[in-house]
Structures are given as C-alpha cells and as structure tokens.
Amino acid sequence: MKKAVLITLMVVFALGFLGTTLRAQGTLAGLWKTIADEGPDKGKAKSYLELFEKDGVFFARINKLLLEPQDKVCDNCKGALKGKPLIGMVLMSDMKKTGKIDKDFGEEYAGGEIMDPDNGKSYRCKIWVKGDNLTVRGYLAMFHRTQNWYRVNP
C-alpha cells in the first residue's frame, strides 16, 4: 500500500515538473507585442505580430499597428514590398527550431531573416522563446540588435 502511494506521488511530481518545464519554454505561435526601442516612441507598444507555423518553419506578419495609421505602407522596403501595406506583411521568415535551450532566454530558433520596415533592410535572425517572452536578435556581420516581444493573451 505504501509503495503504491509512493509511486503515485512520484508520478504526480514528475508530471507536474514536466508541465512546468514545457510552460517555461513556451510555444512560438501566437500574437506578440513589439516595443519601440528607438526614437521618440521608445518604450511604447509599437505593433502586434502574429507568429505562425508552416511545415515546421515559423514566420511573423504584422497584425496591428499601435503607433501608426492602419493603412501605412512600407516606403523604405525594397522590391515587391515597396509601397505595400504593413498590415499582413511578413517581417520574419524561415525560423527553424535548433534544439538548443538557453538557460536565460529559452528555446532557440534560427536560420531565418527579419526585415525592419523602418529602414527596409533584412538581417539574419535568431529568436528564443521562454514562457510569454520572446527575445529577437537581428545580425549584420558581427553586430546585432536585440528586442524583447511579449505574448498577447487573447
């Protein structure tokens, strides 16, 4: 009898620990709030981006602008994106899970690019998800810029 109770307690503890670990890592898909990190609006919520998966690869598109008119177009974008509406535009593409987990940042995704619609430039990208926090880092050669995005709960 004592052995059965002990085994039951061990299973409950293990499942609870596993659930906590999975929640801490989080899931990438969903709605995320970006924060302006430059200029006069620094520190203000800037936009909502929808991160979505297609065939195991993640992308992000603009869902809503919070500091600009909803009909704003990408004046600084290059090629086919120039003059296109920002709402619905895919800014991040080809992000794949690496299998690495950083103890501070969480589960890592890499291999893709992120485009900054303010200047129209694209950068190599790595992201880490941990719970309701997403760390986004764009790289240009040995230089990088990091932003934190926050999950928007429906």
Task: Give the ranges of each region predicted by the language model.
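Positively charged n-region of N-terminal signal peptides that target proteins for export
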Residues: 1-4
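Bacterial N-terminal signal peptides
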Residues: 8-16
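N-terminal helix-cap/turn-to-beta initiation motif at the start of protein domains
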Residues: 19-31
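Short, solvent-exposed loop/hinge segments that bridge or flank secondary-structure elements
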Residues: 29-59, 67-100, 126
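Short beta-strand segments that buttress and anchor functional surface loops
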Residues: 32-37, 110-117, 136-138
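Acidic glycine-/aspartate-rich tracts in secreted/extracellular proteins
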Residues: 65-68, 142
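Signature of long, low-cysteine stretches enriched in small and polar/charged residues
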Residues: 96, 100-117
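Short, exposed beta-strand-loop hairpins at the edges of beta-sheets
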Residues: 117, 124-127, 133-147
